[in-house]
């Protein structure tokens, strides 16, 4: 069957249809069309402003000098840097991590550096999911004027691994630490923030929580869980004056990432945490509410993906799979070389 298309006839019919719409309807449709076309432009402008022009919420909103901040996973990496920079801003610290000796060393260092700083420490292994540990945390912070909670504790896979080959202990630890540990800590600390009618909860997210990541499937799922949990919690605690924000990051030079060199796309912990604490509340161009990507190149990279192929598209998943297969291959070869040296 042959179809004959008359372009002029199609155009005339389209114009007739348009003219049959009441003028108010025409204006409404034109406005919707303009918004659709303008949305990427407005999103890019918001991205630029957030990255380079605007400052986030002043942390003094959450308490005067001497207010306490709780930091989990505090002895290394981003957690250690959050503790250091919060101390520099005048917050006393409750430091929670697995190794008491590391906590003691960090606490002494910060107290010597910042005159008048007070610290409290709690060694707990989040992978054990021990209710007694959370009871000790509740007892430790009882009576403290806490203004900030940083949910930084987390674990990823040792190397990219197919889900069917993931060790059961590793799978269990990732879910227990990233999900249960974050939730239970927040249940202990958040009532204090809500009672004082002001507070901030920062929870570390990840690109892997926004973009499905093969060969890191369990970690990716745990961070996606935190994304939705954090957005939901933000709505619940807003009437109580508590701001809840998910902090999205790509790669940072930490022990978890196993990356040592910085680059345009990979900041060090000091750079990343500085941006995280200075950009609180700048969430205008994000897919999810109450979420922000503080490091400028991470934010730009994420915006490009979301504005083109899409964060959850087949193309993005394929690229993530290829990248992590390559990382796994290199890691296994390195392990083989080291084994031969022994």
Swiss-Prot record:
Compartments annotated for it: namely: Endoplasmic reticulum membrane
Residues at which NADP(+) binds: 70, 125, 133, 152, 219, 223, 252, 254
> What reaction is this protein's catalytic activity?
a very-long-chain (3R)-3-hydroxyacyl-CoA + NADP(+) = a very-long-chain 3-oxoacyl-CoA + NADPH + H(+)
The superkingdom listed in its UniProt entry is Eukaryota
Q: Name one GO biological process term.
A: very long-chain fatty acid biosynthetic process
Q: What class of enzyme is it?
A: oxidoreductase
Q: Which InterPro entries match?
A: 3_ketoreductase_fungal, NAD(P)-bd_dom_sf, Sc_DH/Rdtase_CS, SDR_fam
Name assigned to this protein: Very-long-chain 3-oxoacyl-CoA reductase
């Amino acid at each position: 069957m042959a179809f004959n298309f008359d372009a002029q006839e199609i155009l005339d019919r389209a114009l007739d249809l348009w003219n049959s719409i009441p003028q108010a309807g025409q204006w409404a449709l034109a406005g919707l069309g303009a918004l659709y076309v303008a949305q990427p432009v407005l999103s890019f402008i918001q991205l630029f402003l957030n990255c380079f022009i605007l400052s986030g919420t002043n942390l003094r909103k959450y308490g005067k000098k001497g207010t306490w901040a709780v930091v989990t996973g505090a002895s290394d990496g981003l957690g250690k840097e959050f503790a250091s920079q919060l101390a520099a801003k005048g917050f006393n610290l409750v430091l929670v991590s697995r190794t008491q000796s590391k906590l003691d060393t960090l606490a002494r260092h910060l107290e010597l550096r910042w005159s008048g700083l007070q610290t409290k420490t709690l060694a707990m292994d989040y992978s054990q999911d021990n209710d007694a540990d959370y009871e000790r945390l509740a007892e430790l912070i009882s009576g403290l004027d806490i203004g900030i909670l940083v949910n930084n504790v987390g674990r990823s896979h040792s190397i990219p691994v197919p889900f069917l080959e993931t060790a059961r202990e590793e799978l269990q630890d990732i879910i227990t630490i990233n999900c249960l540990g974050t939730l239970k800590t927040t249940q202990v600390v958040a009532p204090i923030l809500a009672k004082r009618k002001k507070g901030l909860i920062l929870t570390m997210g990840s690109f892997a929580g926004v973009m499905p990541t093969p060969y890191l499937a369990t970690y990716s799922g745990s961070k996606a869980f935190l994304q939705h949990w954090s957005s939901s919690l933000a709505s619940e605690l807003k009437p109580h004056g508590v701001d809840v924000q998910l902090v999205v990051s790509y790669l940072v030079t930490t022990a978890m990432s196993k990356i040592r060199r910085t680059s345009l796309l990979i900041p060090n912990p000091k750079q990343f945490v500085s941006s995280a604490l200075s950009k609180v509340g700048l969430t205008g161009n994000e897919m999810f509410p109450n979420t922000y990507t503080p490091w400028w190149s991470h934010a730009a990279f994420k915006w490009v993906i979301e504005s083109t192929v899409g964060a959850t598209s087949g193309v993005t998943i394929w690229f993530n799979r290829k990248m992590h297969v390559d990382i796994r291959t290199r890691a296994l070869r390195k392990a083989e070389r080291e084994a031969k040296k022994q």
